[in-house]
């Protein structure tokens, strides 16, 4: 597996050889490598989560697993008898793997991708109106494999949606057919239309029409009553943005929903302490929430088996061949 290859951390060369072994207190013997390209020496834990880590790996994993199963930060500190800053350091080490694994996932090619988009809200720092809160979390999840592409938090504005659409743009470049399904939120499609469009030149006079790129489809399900809306009512299922004439339009009405994304957020409110309702908000921050979301992203996609597919989401999507073990995850080089 390419993720686990031993490359030089200085020049990224794969031409390395074992120089010697040395003994550690908690992890047994380890290897010291020599790069035959730049002649630098480095340990097998260089630039990994295990670098300068003296605590046994089982303790670190139990703490991270508890944090992604609903235990709060202070409760974790009391239960496992470790310092708060130590727990935060372990979380940050694991969160640093998110950009590495995300880029590794993007280099793969996909024939057909169906992505659901949804948002969830939690209070940050203090209780403010939802439109002013920075606790909105935006999710893009693959329907078939349950692989999470985007899990970003912040204020519900154009900047947050642009981050998700930039991810979609990269997926579009690596897939032949992409369908985006949302529950009434039109900003996904608006920004996607701005970024991923093309001009249809027919040779007729006038300005060429602008459409989504070939193979890209966006569908919206308008939920709830529209009795209080003035003017014409929107249909329940819509394709509000013009699509390429050669794009296959076969999307069943029954398939236009974001139920899997909503179910994910229902589970997240149990598995992530910052999303649990009726909790104190004095200890929450956007930075801390994003750090924990990145940890959850790594464990959900590459470690934890999903109960529906009975596979790790990354395996179901075809990103990796098998589930990563915890020691293997901790040996991946950080960004």
Language model segments and positions:
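Residue-level recognition of single "structural anchor" positions
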Residues: 1-335
């Amino acid at each position: 597996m390419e993720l686990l290859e031993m490359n030089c951390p200085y020049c990224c060369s794969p031409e390395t050889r074992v120089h010697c072994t040395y003994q550690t207190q908690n992890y047994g013997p380890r290897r010291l490598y020599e790069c035959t390209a730049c002649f630098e020496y480095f340990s097998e834990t260089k630039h990994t989560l295990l670098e300068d880590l003296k605590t046994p790996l089982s303790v670190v994993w139990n703490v991270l697993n508890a944090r992604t199963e609903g235990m709060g930060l202070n409760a974790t500190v009391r239960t496992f008898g470790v310092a708060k800053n130590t727990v935060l350091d372990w979380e940050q080490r694991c969160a640093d793997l998110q950009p590495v694994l995300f880029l590794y996932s993007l280099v793969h090619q996909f024939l057909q991708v169906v992505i659901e988009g949804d948002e969830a809200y939690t209070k940050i720092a203090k209780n403010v109106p939802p439109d002013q809160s920075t606790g909105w979390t935006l999710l893009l999840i693959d329907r078939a494999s349950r692989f999470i592409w985007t899990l970003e938090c912040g204020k519900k504005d154009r900047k947050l949606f642009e981050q998700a659409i930039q991810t979609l743009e990269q997926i579009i470049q690596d897939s032949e057919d992409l369908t985006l399904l949302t529950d009434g939120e039109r900003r996904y499609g608006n920004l996607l239309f701005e970024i991923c469009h093309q001009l249809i030149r027919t040779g007729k006079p006038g300005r060429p029409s602008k459409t989504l790129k070939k193979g890209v489809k966006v569908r919206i399900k308008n939920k709830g009553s529209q009795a209080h809306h003035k003017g014409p009512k929107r249909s329940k299922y819509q394709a509000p943005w013009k699509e390429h004439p050669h794009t296959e339009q076969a999307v069943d009405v029954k398939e236009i929903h974001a139920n899997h994304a909503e179910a994910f957020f229902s589970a997240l409110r149990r598995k992530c302490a910052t999303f649990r309702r009726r909790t104190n908000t004095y200890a929450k921050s956007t930075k801390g929430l994003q750090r924990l979301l990145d940890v959850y992203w790594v464990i959900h996609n590459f470690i934890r088996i999903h109960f529906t597919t009975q596979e790790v989401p990354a395996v179901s999507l075809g990103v990796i061949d098998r589930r990563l073990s915890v020691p293997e995850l901790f040996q991946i080089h950080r960004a």
